[in-house]
Amino acid sequence: MEKISKVILSNMCLIYDNNGHILVIERTKNDWPGINLPGGHVEENETIDEAVVREIKEETGLTIKNPKLCAIKEWPWGENLRYLGLLYKCNEFEGEIKSSDEGKVFRIKRSDLNKYKLSQDLDELISLIENAKL
């Protein structure tokens, strides 16, 4: 008998400007330590694009426009469960950057990324986003 895996949809967004900066979050919870890209889960009855806009607003205070889906990353998570990470990028945004209960949000130079303690797979995720053929 085949087992069907439960799938949890999540998103992350590489928010960048034209001066070489990216937006990162240092999460409060220790389940994924290190800096990461902002994002979160897709909720019931919302599209994947609605979810990334909502999550970015909740975590960073910014309203993003025209996020581009660049890649999908899969993480097996125990028996019969997997996460699908929907990886976006966006350079159209408005509002003031503010941290949330999720963690401290701040801008860094993209070229300085490896000076920070990175969360698991962050290098790979950013590479997937930056190398996407859109």
Predicted region positions:
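Conserved hydrophobic "DFG−1" position in protein kinase catalytic cores
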Residues: 15-16, 24, 90-92, 107
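A short coil-to-beta-strand element that immediately follows conserved catalytic motifs
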Residues: 63-71
